[in-house]
């Protein structure tokens, strides 16, 4: 099976690529490297012990996507590509709506032209907003609280509508929270460009010496467990 990974050089995409290769799949990656680098692709090939066909493209370009599908006999797609910083989405909502929704619609259109009918979409638990009940299950109501979450929810709805119109199409929507960790080899992991959007990259960067220290802000909640009470409860 030949699988296209959009955003496949990113944190989750790179680990997915390695696992697919280990399972015997051929992998094609389309990534604009806005939050990764070419070295990651080399490491994917090293860990997967196979060659990856890599396209440095913006998935928002329908012509570029058309080239990928024309040059490869794609069996299935996993769609990771998209902007993903909640805070940035609040400051720059139009950029997020245009980028993430254009990418989704372009991908679906090109898939239909090439009769590719299997898609896994990397959605997000942000579609649940602030849940009234935890733990969350799939039956919880959705109500997003930021533009990033809305782009994920809108992409899901577009996919539902396309599925309703095309019975051959099979789409899985994955709503997950932020993962942490790295490949056991240490060769790939979360290494964002610019300022990290969550805690774990800061910890990793301190561990490897890229940052001098991990800053903890505030000193007026001296609790035994620290994070759990100080940062969440208070």
Listing of model-derived features with the role each one plays in the protein:
Residues 1-182:
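N-terminal Rossmann-like NAD(P)+-binding domain of SDR-like oxidoreductases, especially those catalyzing
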Residues 160-233:
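NAD(P)-dependent short-chain dehydrogenase/reductase
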């Amino acid at each position: 099976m030949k699988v296209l990974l959009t955003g496949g050089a990113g944190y989750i995409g790179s680990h997915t690529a390695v696992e697919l290769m280990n399972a015997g799949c051929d992998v094609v990656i389309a990534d604009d490297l806005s939050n990764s680098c070419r070295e990651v692709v080399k490491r994917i090939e090293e860990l997967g012990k196979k060659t990856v066909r890599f396209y440095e493209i913006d998935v928002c370009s329908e012509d570029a996507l058309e080239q990928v599908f024309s040059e490869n006999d794609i069996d299935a797609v996993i769609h990771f590509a998209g902007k993903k910083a909640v805070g940035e989405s609040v400051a720059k909502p139009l950029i997020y709506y245009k980028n993430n929704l254009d990418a989704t619609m372009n991908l679906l259109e090109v898939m239909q032209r090439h009769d590719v009918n299997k898609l896994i979409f990397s959605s997000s638990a942000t579609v649940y907003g602030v849940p009234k009940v935890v733990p969350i299950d799939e039956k919880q109501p959705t109500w997003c609280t930021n533009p990033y979450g809305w782009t994920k929810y809108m992409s899901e709805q577009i996919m539902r509508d396309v599925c309703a119109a095309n019975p051959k199409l099979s789409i899985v929507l994955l709503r997950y929270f932020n993962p942490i960790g790295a490949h056991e080899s240490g060769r790939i992991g979360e290494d964002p460009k610019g300022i990290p959007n969550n805690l774990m990259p800061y910890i990793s960067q301190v561990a490897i010496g890229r940052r001098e220290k991990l800053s903890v802000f505030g000193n007026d909640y001296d609790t035994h467990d620290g994070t759990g009470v100080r940062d969440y409860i208070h």
